[in-house]
Regions:
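Conserved aromatic-histidine-acidic binding/catalytic patches
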Residues: 19, 211-214, 218, 261, ...
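Membrane-associated alpha-helical segments
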Residues: 255-380
């Protein structure tokens, strides 16, 4: 039995990117790097360099994700369509409680290696998974997060609590705290890992979804100009004379090309933003959050902040599509109008040609009549000369009588001959 070439790859796809097994206390640093195809290859090579420095095997040539334990820290590397994520996990000892600042997981990674991550940083986040009592939890939240922008909720049906301020701090990182303590409920290490992965994905997909917002704002200028141009063309078409229509059709075609070109360049971005927005909503549903008194939930924050941005992207996409359809309809109407006028011009031209042909036929018949008279005249003249000569030889009729008798015979013969010749020529051209 021959296996399908990609059987194992397809089978193992459902097991790709499994969540980490996590136990508090834990420090996590998460990076999202925008990367094109070349930078994604560089990312794989950059990862191989770190593994080589720690005497670990390199990733496979086509690897799209990797989890590796370096001892002092664990690294999770994932390759996506538009970006690459690096998640650094550092277990903490219980002595972290007495420290002024929470440890950052990125400190355990060679800083020179971090500084050279391929691509452009879209998102960077510090997240801590801790156990703490109510009083200490409030102190940690107050010390590390901005209370005026605080977002918090219980998650996994009350088995943990999550806090963040969705803000960039002076170091360029956003921050989040997850409390999984015995005072709430016992939370398995595997389920805690799934929770943290979903929280990181919410932040990642939120930022990637927002990539469509600058594009939507930039599209507004083009769309406003295009709509104004289309309105001007519509007014001009209403009052245009036939000789102006080709110019209007050319302007309309240029506008259609400009709008379609811009639509093609932005459609994939808007579609991607919509897909990432759906992922954000699904991940929020997955964490099963519930409200903490006095705080907005993640769902509340996204509804107030992210949803309007995504509506702007969707509005730009629908506006582009509507403008394209209106241009197409107007182009079809104008082309139909031009074609009808061309048909009318062609019919008028054919009528004029038929009229000229009838006139030519009448002239031809007139010329034929004159030709019969002229040929008859000359032939009768020749007969008169023959009759004069014949009279000397005893021809009984006078030359005048002979000429008079010859006129009808010659005229009929000439007319009949020209008629046959005309019919022959006509048949040869049909």
């Amino acid at each position: 039995m021959k296996d399908f070439a990609q059987r194992y790859a397809l089978h193992n796809e459902v097991h790709a990117r499994p969540p980490e097994i996590m136990s508090p206390p834990l420090a996590i640093t998460h990076f999202v790097m925008l990367a094109d195809a070349a930078q994604q290859d560089s990312s794989r090579a950059h990862l191989a360099e770190l593994l080589r420095d720690h005497h670990l095997p390199p990733p496979e040539a086509q690897a799209s994700h990797l989890r590796m334990d370096f001892g002092a820290f664990r690294l999770r590397w994932e390759l996506h369509t538009e970006f690459v994520t690096y998640t650094i996990l550092q277990p903490l000892d219980e002595a972290w409680v007495s420290r002024q600042e929470l440890p950052q997981a990125m400190a355990a990674v060679p800083q020179a290696w971090l500084a050279k991550l391929p691509g452009e940083c879209l998102c960077s986040m510090h997240l801590w998974v801790l156990t703490a009592g109510q009083g200490q939890r409030r102190e940690l939240v107050r010390e590390h997060l901005r209370e005026d922008m605080l977002v918090g909720s219980t998650v996994l049906d009350g088995q943990a609590e999550f806090f963040t301020d969705m803000a960039l701090h002076p170091d360029g990182f956003s921050r989040a705290l997850v409390f999984a303590e015995s005072g709430l409920k016992n939370l398995s290490a595997r389920r805690l890992g799934r929770l943290v992965q979903r929280l990181l994905e919410i932040e990642t997909y939120r930022m990637v979804a927002l990539l469509g917002l600058p594009t939507a704002r930039a599209a507004a200028t083009l769309l406003t100009r295009g709509e104004a141009e289309l309105a001007s063309l519509a007014q001009a078409i209403r009052t245009a004379q036939s000789e102006q229509e080709p110019e209007l059709l050319d302007r309309l075609s240029r506008l259609a090309g400009e709008v379609e070109s811009h639509y093609a360049s932005t459609h994939s971005r808007f579609s991607a933003s919509n897909a990432y927005f759906d992922l954000v909503n699904r991940r929020i549903t997955d964490i099963a959050e519930a409200r903490l008194e006095g705080l907005q939930t993640i769902r509340d924050f996204m509804d107030r902040r992210l949803t309007p941005a995504m509506n702007t992207c969707d509005w730009a996409r629908r506006r582009q599509q509507a403008l394209s359809e209106r241009i197409s309809r107007m182009s079809n109407l104008l082309r139909t109008r031009v074609e009808i006028e061309h048909q009318q011009s062609s019919q008028a031209l054919l009528a004029a040609m038929n009229k000229r042909q009838d006139l030519q036929l009448k002239l031809q018949r007139t010329v034929e009549g004159l030709s019969v008279a002229a040929i008859t005249y000359y032939l009768v003249g020749l007969i008169a000369y023959l009759a004069k000569g014949a009279s000397a030889l005893g021809w009984p009729l006078s030359p005048e009588t002979s000429s008079a008798l010859a006129v009808p015979l010659v005229a009929v013969s000439v007319w009949w001959s020209l008629r046959k010749l005309h019919q022959k020529i006509t048949q040869s051209h049909t």
